[in-house]
Swiss-Prot record:
Chain residues that bind ATP: G168, G169, A170, G171, V172, G173, K174, T175
Pfam family, one: ATP-synt_VA_C
Family statement drawn from the similarity comment of this UniProt entry: Belongs to the ATPase alpha/beta chains family.
Name of protein: ATP synthase subunit beta
Membrane topology annotation: Peripheral membrane protein
EC number(s) on file: 7.1.2.2
Subunit relationships: F-type ATPases have 2 components, CF(1) - the catalytic core - and CF(0) - the membrane proton channel. CF(1) has five subunits: alpha(3), beta(3), gamma(1), delta(1), epsilon(1). CF(0) has three main subunits: a(1), b(2) and c(9-12). The alpha and beta chains form an alternating ring which encloses part of the gamma chain. CF(1) is attached to CF(0) by a central stalk formed by the gamma and epsilon chains, while a peripheral stalk is formed by the delta and b chains.
Class of enzymatic activity (EC top level): translocase
Compartment list: Cell membrane
Reactions mediated catalytically: ATP + H2O + 4 H(+)(in) = ADP + phosphate + 5 H(+)(out)
Superkingdom field: Bacteria
HAMAP family: ATP_synth_beta_bact (MF_01347)
Species for this entry: Parafrankia sp. (strain EAN1pec)
Gene Ontology CC: one annotated term: plasma membrane
Length: 479
């Protein structure tokens, strides 16, 4: 495992050299070095810049060798105040971030500097550019990751060490699901979470930190932010920094890790900006020609090694709701499951507002989850799909015009729909309802009996915001 040291040397064992700034165009900086001192691609460089009498150190990352002993680098900060001829120090190593327990409960930038405190006592730093695990280190079996959230476990089960897309608009509950998953990993499984804020609003990042602190889940979480006001180089690398922290928890501390990336589209967008700045010819719809390669370099590191895993939950913005856009389409090829949040369900007050018909998973298959689970999930989806097909008729003619069989099915579907709601631990302070973790066996059995009509005699409202079927029976007694 690679760990940076206090006195870096290059891969060839030589002492890093000193270069000079030759040109500055926005975040792109060309630097001249002596012929035998050219730094390698991805090497971090340091240069001083002065604004209003205050000197600060800029970090650059080598992106290209452009000839004439010159490299082209991307700055991780604003380049205001940088002048031609300024000395540039080769660090001899890539950008490195702190790893280990010292990162828990803190917020970092792409360079590994803490944003919420002055300093963290980290003993180990790892470079953000790392290889994916070797093939013989990977976990060969496919295993379900039980969340204790009924709608997810039943209809769109997550894969341990897999990649899950979380799609939804503003205000439908993405942040609450993220907080709940962080809490469940920490409390139910003794795991740790890492959050990467990629190109999102600074206000949202601040709100998330404060809400997680209030909910009591911050102590088991490391957060890394590169927000939308940052240069494109920062937004392109922040996900790699967070992933590096997650890899340490998996490989060294032997923990299961949940990695959140919000928003993976901004990662692609930043790559497009950097590609244009470097003068590369754009590809389809103006995206970078290296889109698939950049996405693969990130996604292939998110996996299970023997006995331990990084499970990733990635928020996905879909431009103009076009699923064929190259950015989301490239992401979809790596995903094991999609959790789609539906505003229509949110408007009904049903949370989590997960669409049972649009969400999917590659392991919703009897080979992976067992025949009973598969049959129950498909029957639930069949009933809900039929209910959806009948809604236009109900709206125009009324429910009385349906056949007796369809009336029974509609009433059953409404009970199932409400039973898919569930109180969350992190929302207790708002709802006043204690959070519930529902074991998978109980979830399957409850929905199997629901689809068979065993609970048709209970009122609809009894199924709203409850954990297991026992809660529904208790609610019915109180109605």
């Amino acid at each position: 495992m690679t760990v940076t040291t206090s006195s870096p040397t290059t891969a060839e064992g030589r002492t890093p050299g000193i270069g000079r700034v030759a040109r500055v165009i926005g975040p792109v900086v060309d630097v001249e070095f002596a012929p035998d001192e050219l730094p390698e691609i991805y090497t971090a460089l340091h240069v001083d810049r002065t604004i209003d009498g205050e000197t600060a150190v800029l970090t650059l990352e080598v992106a290209q060798h452009i000839g004439d002993n010159t490299i082209r680098a991307i700055s991780m900060q604003q380049t205001d105040g940088l002048v031609r001829g300024a000395p540039v120090r080769d660090t001899g190593a890539p950008i490195s971030v702190p790893v280990g327990n010292a990162t828990k409960g803190h917020v970092f930038n792409v360079l590994g500097n803490p944003l919420d405190v002055d300093k963290v006592d980290a003993e180990t730093y790892w470079p953000i550019h790392r290889s994916a695990p070797a093939f013989d280190q990977l976990e060969s079996k496919t295993e379900m990751f039980t969340t204790g959230i009924k709608v997810i476990d039943l209809l769109a089960p997550y894969v341990r060490g897999g990649k899950i897309g979380l799609m939804g608009g503003a205000g439908v509950g993405k942040t609450v699901i993220i907080q709940e998953m962080i809490r469940r990993v920490a409390k139910e499984f003794g795991g740790v979470s890492v959050f990467a804020g990629v190109g999102e609003r600074t206000r949202e990042g601040n709100d998330l930190f404060l809400e997680m602190t209030e909910a009591g889940v911050i102590e088991d979480t490391a957060l890394v932010f590169g927000q939308m006001d940052e240069p494109p180089g920062t937004r392109l690398r922040v996900a790699l920094g967070a992933l590096t922290m997650a890899e340490y928890f998996r490989d060294v501390q032997k923990q299961d890790v949940l990695l959140f990336i919000d928003n993976i589209f901004r990662f692609t967008q930043a790559g497009s900006e950097v590609s244009t700045l470097l003068g590369r010819m754009p590809s389809a719809v103006g995206y970078q020609p290296t889109l698939a390669d950049e996405m693969g370099a990130l996604q292939e590191r998110i996996t299970s090694t023997r006995g331990h895993s990084i499970t990733s939950l990635q928020a996905i913005y879909v431009p103009a709701d076009d699923l064929t856009d190259p950015a989301p389409a490239t992401t979809f090829t790596h995903l094991d499951a999609n959790t789609v949040l539906d505003r229509a369900i949110s408007d009904l007050g049903i949370y989590p507002a997960v669409s049972p018909l649009d969400s999917n998973s590659r392991i919703l298959d009897a080979r992976y989850i067992g025949q009973e689970h598969y049959d129950t999930a498909r029957e639930v989806q069949r009933i809900l799909q039929r209910y959806k097909d009948l809604q236009d008729i109900i709206a125009i003619l009324g429910i009385d015009e349906l056949s007796e069989e369809d009336k029974i099915l509609v009433n059953r579907a409404r009970r199932i729909q409400r039973f898919l709601s569930q109180p969350f631990f992190v929302a207790e302070q708002f709802t006043g309802i204690p959070g519930k973790f529902v074991p998978l066996d109980e979830t399957i059995d409850s929905f199997r009996r629901l689809t068979q009509g065993d609970y048709d005699h209970l009122p609809e409202q009894a199924f709203f915001m409850c954990g297991g079927i026992e809660d529904a029976e208790k609610n019915a007694e109180n109605l």
